[in-house]
Amino acid sequence: MALLQISEPGMAPAPHQRRLAVGIDLGTTNSLVAAVRNSVPEVLPDEAGRVLLPSVVRYLEKGGRRIGHEAKEQAATDPRNTIVSVKRFMGRGKAEVEGAANAPYEFVDAPGMVQIRTIDGVKSPVEVSAEILATLRYRAEDSLGDDLVGAVITVPAYFDDAQRQATKDAARLAGLNVLRLLNEPTAAAIAYGLDNAAEGLYAVYDLGGGTFDLSILKLTKGVFEVLAAGGDSALGGDDFDHALFGHVLAQAGIDAKTLAPEDVRLLLDRVRVLKEALSSAPEAALDVTLSSGAHLVQTISHDTFASLVEPLVQRTLTPTRKALRDAQVTPADIKGVVLVGGATRMPVIRDAVAKYFGQPPLVNLDPDQVVALGAAIQADLLAGNRGTGDDWLLLDVIPLSLGVETMGGLVEKIIPRNSTIPIARAQEFTTFKDGQTAMAIHVVQGERELVADCRSLARFELRGIPPMTAGAARIRVTYQVDADGLLSVFAREQLSGVEASVVVKPSYGLADDDIAKMLEDSFKTAEIDMRARALREAQVEAERMLEATQAALAADGELLETDERAQVDALAAALRAVAQGDDTNAIEAATKALADGTDEFAARRMDKSIKRALSGRRLDEI
């Protein structure tokens, strides 16, 4: 009798049955993948031992592409086809993309999300991000030696619904099952809190390549509660590069509009190196020759750089003050400030943070890796690999208010910002005119009072409202936000019971058909392999059928009449004629025809075998 193994819900019954899940930090500049191995989270390196994957994709002719370090090396020589900092474009229309003026790309003004024309066709940010995620997925599967059950992917806390949905779509294209979208500051807090057994109020200051987040968290006995979140999804280290880029050109008397795309990318790469050098030196030199022959030689001091980027530093402090205000705490209440993101290595940032909070920031964890490590811990837990010490709870928040448009273009907030998720809130509305039988529901996200100043997420209609006098109908609108921060909206007229709903998929220009097509395109090689396998299986079955038929005819051909034998021979010849071809359907059809055509022959052979076996035996011997 077999014994059933019984384990606690959510726990793996045995170590060898551990389900493999990873945490992925999909960054603007670099991306990482991490996993928990032997109860310790660690970042997974590539075959060369490098843990950082540059978030760069270069497109080549005929579907070729380069991803990561190899693509980054060619960014200056092939800037139009080498996409960098794509995270800044996720879920964004062309008008919303800041810094696009200095980007060397040919933008396509598609509805919703901006797209980029390359030598391999027009690419959306979702497709580009999917290439990066797929590369990390392959790295993880190679490192861990098996397929993944899923991944926790981090996003800036201030990403709105459109940007979050775009990230999930990219993961889907990359063949990843998303266990959770986790806010980056929260992931950092998990890694820091579990590593240091920290308790109290903490601020997570997260300045990446393209986004800024500030979260206030309360850590108490394994409970990670986000009290407030603020940020700017269009502010990051790239903006510091552009400030330095503009200064260098101004000093040289060069108009950025006159630069070739190759020179733009070359200069941006060089000023980034210059910026990083200024993190450890009082001054640094720039020496670069442009394609026009112009030779730029400049020395930039740290003081000059600090002066240039001071407005950007102040832009990070504005949402910081707002988050503290929302959490109803002061800088003096904060026990520690955790720095996240490569841009926080700049002394100008560390000095500003220390001055504002009145204490030096915590830097004992690598700011480039801490988010991925926290995501790996959460992924391991969600995959069911609960172990000793994993009794912790994560309470995250929604960063921007969700509301509905009311008469006059006003916004009625249903779920205020910094509400703990998952959450559901409802509010009742009524009709505006006598006899009104339908209501248009416009879902928006933002903090402003006017719809025009907020981001439109979705529209749908509730029809079938019974005709009544204005104000008599009662329409209950329910907003429901899941643990990923994604929204569903339901509307119900209370008297008649008519209802309508929408799962918000923001109109950033990527419909389900588009996603399906991308999936189809991305799996072309796999489909070709599957077709080849199906063809070979059909050929093998055809060969088996022909051999079996030939052997049967040789052994018992006398069981068939002349016309029956001719029919079997004809069916076998027909199968033999197509068996080595490449038409799988034709081979399968001919194989089935021969099988059906020899059914009676097989039955006669069976009868003959039975008679032979029973011949000369008495009934009581059987």
From Swiss-Prot:
Could you tell me which cysteines form disulfide bridges? none
Please tell me whether the keyword Iron-sulfur is annotated for this protein: no
| Organism field | Burkholderia cenocepacia (strain HI2424)
Q: Which GO terms describe its biological process?
A: iron-sulfur cluster assembly
Q: Spell out the SUPFAM superfamilies in the cross-references.
A: Actin-like ATPase domain, Heat shock protein 70kD (HSP70), C-terminal subdomain, Heat shock protein 70kD (HSP70), peptide-binding domain
Cited InterPro entries: ATPase_NBD, Heat_shock_70_CS, HscA_NBD, HSP70_C_sf, HSP70_peptide-bd_sf, Hsp_70_fam, ISC_FeS_clus_asmbl_HscA
Q: Which PANTHER family match?
A: HEAT SHOCK PROTEIN 70KDA
Source domain of life: Bacteria
Which key words tag this protein in UniProt?
Answer: ATP-binding, Chaperone, Nucleotide-binding
This protein is called: Chaperone protein HscA homolog
Q: What GO molecular function annotation could you give as one example from this UniProt entry?
A: ATP-dependent protein folding chaperone
Q: Which family does it belong to?
A: Belongs to the heat shock protein 70 family.
Keyword presence, Chaperone? yes
The task this protein performs is described as: Chaperone involved in the maturation of iron-sulfur cluster-containing proteins. Has a low intrinsic ATPase activity which is markedly stimulated by HscB.
